Amino acid sequence: AAFATLMIPFDLLGGIVLPRRFARKTPRLPRLILSWLRAVLIQSACLTASLWIVLQAGQTIGIAGAIAAVLMIQIGLVATQKWLAILTGGISLESNVADIDAAGPRIATAHHMDSGFTGSIVGLPGAEEVVVPQSWQSRMTPEELDTQLVRRIGAIRTGSRTRGLLLALLVNTGTFGICAVLPNAGVTTVPQLATAALYFTFASFLWLLLLPRISREGVFEADRFAFDNGHSVRQIEATANQIESLHDDEPQRSRRLESIFHPVPCVRRRVAELSLRTRSIHGCWNAARMTLFLSWACGGFLSRAVHCNIGRPELWVILPTD
């Protein structure tokens, strides 16, 4: 409750003031308030339940039990991400009857209000579902939409999405384990666990600076998959530009700024990367932002307090990606 209250002015800035300043479509204020309250209540309930489970495991088994509980809760979050997005963000999903590849993952269309919603890949490995924003179907050409679907299917087939997921699980689980043994932290009392969660939040900020580079390699790998499967550089560039205009609208940025804060590289860098004949680096698709969502299991407070989703409940569970 204290954290939610502290975040109110920042949520107003990120969810209302800045989007309207840059002429982004936003719901009316009463609807925004109701959606924010619903999202805060659901996220708070998830965080509380997660920490309670970790506390019970810590009191019963010890630090190893608490770490195992954190890992299992994260796996549960991955499995239920779609449903949490529906409950928290208020989006609705419609499964597509005719997928572009019968042997590929299921594809669902998301009906949403936030212009920054990009959809993602949800579900456990082997049971993935590609979520596509409804706005893309009305504002992108069929060729651009097909290119983007092929990219996301490529993230699955190359293993990049699974690698990103495993990295996020490893980072959060390992970080929590370290934080739980720091001074005044622990897993057997509420004050100890609260201290561990605070340590974890500070550590998460450091990961925000380190993980984007690995995530960018996943973007490059998905672009390469689309190129190798018949989509030209021009098509991939046009698709990336269209998505950029719909969401971040930041086509040019310094390399230093991008290297720290942006897990999705700018279009210019993506096109330059495609000029390479082969790629030897395997990426971890969406690892940086998946780490934020999965931090719910560890009491992480940064999951809804980063520049891409602050004050925007539709983006708290499915954070923006490429």
Regions found by a protein language model. Name each.
Residues 1-188, 210-297, 301-303, 309-322:
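Polar-ligand-bearing catalytic/cofactor-coordination segments
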Residues 197, 201-213:
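Hydrophobic alpha-helical transmembrane segments of polytopic membrane proteins
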